[in-house]
C-alpha cells in the first residue's frame, strides 16, 4: 500500500510506464489503475466514470485514491482557485464518496479506515463550501 501511495502520480506526472517500476505486480497494477486516461472517442465524463469504476479492481488503488483525496481536500483551500475548488468538491461528491461506499462494501475489513476518511473528507468539504457560500453572499 505504501508503495502505491508514494508512486500513484508517477505515470501521469513523469510519463513512466507502470511496468517499468521496480515494484510488485500488485503495485504496478494499482498505479496503472490510478493513471487517469481519456481514451479515443471518450468524453472526460465517460473517462471519469470508467476510471472510478476500474479503481475497484484493486484494494490498493481504491484506498490510495481515497487517502489521496483526503490529503488533497485538506490542503486545497489555500492553493486552489475558486473555480478549481468548486470542480474538485463536485468531483468529490459525485465520484469519490460513492467510490468510498463501494470500497466499504467490497473491502469491509477496511471499514474503520474508511469511516475516518469519509468523516474527514466530508468535514473539510462542508467547511469549505460553507466558507465559499458566506464569501459569495458578502460580495
Question: Language-model segments: what does each one mean?
Answer:
Residues 1-139:
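Active-site helical microenvironments for divalent-metal-assisted chemistry
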Amino acid at each position: 500500500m505504501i508503495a502505491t501511495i508514494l508512486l500513484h502520480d508517477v505515470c501521469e506526472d513523469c510519463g513512466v510506464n507502470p511496468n517499468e517500476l521496480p515494484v510488485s505486480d500488485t503495485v504496478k497494477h494499482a498505479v496503472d489503475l490510478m493513471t487517469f486516461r481519456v481514451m479515443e472517442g471518450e468524453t472526460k465524463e465517460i473517462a471519469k466514470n470508467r476510471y472510478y469504476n476500474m479503481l475497484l479492481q484493486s484494494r490498493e488503488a481504491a484506498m490510495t485514491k481515497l487517502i489521496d483525496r483526503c490529503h488533497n481536500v485538506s490542503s486545497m483551500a489555500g492553493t486552489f482557485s475558486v473555480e478549481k475548488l468548486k470542480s474538485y468538491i463536485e468531483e468529490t461528491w459525485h465520484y469519490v464518496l460513492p467510490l468510498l461506499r463501494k470500497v466499504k462494501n467490497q473491502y469491509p475489513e477496511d471499514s474503520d479506515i474508511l469511516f475516518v476518511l469519509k468523516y474527514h473528507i466530508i468535514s473539510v468539504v462542508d467547511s469549505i463550501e460553507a466558507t465559499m457560500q458566506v464569501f459569495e453572499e458578502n460580495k
